[in-house]
Amino acid sequence: MNNAIFPNKFKVALAAQQVQIGCWSALASPITTEVLGLAGFDWLVLDGEHAPNDVTTLIPQLMALKGSASAPVVRVPTNEPVIIKRMLDIGFYNFLIPFVETQEEAARAVASTRYPPEGIRGVSVSHRANMFGTVPDYFAQSNKNITIIVQIESQLGVDNVDAIAATEGVDGIFVGPSDLAAAMGHLGNASHPDVQQTIQHIFARAKAHGKPCGILAPVEADARRYLEWGATFVAVGSDLGVFRAGTQKLADTFKK
């Protein structure tokens, strides 16, 4: 092989508990995604849950990252095998699964990414991920090079964090701070002490099971605190947030 698909460097870095600094991509544009890739982030989330992304918009973004060292991570809209299969076939190896609340849901996400007998992924002999049949060892290598990160963002997920983190095939735990805050009765206030304490608890339980933990933290002070608490993969901003802040600052400079 000469295409450097394997090994999955992001999966290797997570397993080694290496700090990985990332960014969120929500504008669904190959141009902005390419710019993010050139910035030097270790990983990028291409959001399919809250951003207007689907297969047709994600393929150009994967192409835009072809020459980048940033690992593309897709957040699927839901933990559904057919959706996950389509993302696998277009070339994603790293998955962020939203709203996982039980060990069974975590195991289902893992199974959706594995070919039988280890999982339930459907087989296509020619697709973008295996360079349309030109990667000879794709089937032998694929199962062990998929990264599964599950999001904990509800009270039930918090209650089951140990079982979720212990699930075979789960590579990392990701905290969804906004939804977690809402579930705890603090909508719009992820900085509430109770929410922060719960985030720290999730990190600790993930670490106890040898699993790296991550979070989205667009405020620098928050990101640095989470890193101090043991988070190893942190998204420190988003293309949408940076674009909005930058354009607002530019307008204010001349309009006020």
Curated annotation (Swiss-Prot):
Superkingdom per UniProt: Bacteria
GO terms of molecular function: 2-dehydro-3-deoxyglucarate aldolase activity; magnesium ion binding
Pathway assignment: Carbohydrate acid metabolism; galactarate degradation; D-glycerate from galactarate: step 2/3
Enzyme Commission no: 4.1.2.20
Cofactor annotation remark: Binds 1 Mg(2+) ion per subunit.
Catalytic activity: 5-dehydro-4-deoxy-D-glucarate = 2-hydroxy-3-oxopropanoate + pyruvate; 2-dehydro-3-deoxy-D-glucarate = 2-hydroxy-3-oxopropanoate + pyruvate
Cofactor: Mg(2+)
Active site, per annotation: H50
Keywords in alphabetical order: Lyase, Magnesium, Metal-binding
Subunit organization: Homohexamer; trimer of dimers.
Matches recorded under NCBIfam families: GarL, PRK10558.1
Family according to the record: Belongs to the HpcH/HpaI aldolase family. KDGluc aldolase subfamily.
Protein name (record): 5-keto-4-deoxy-D-glucarate aldolase
Name of the coding gene: garL
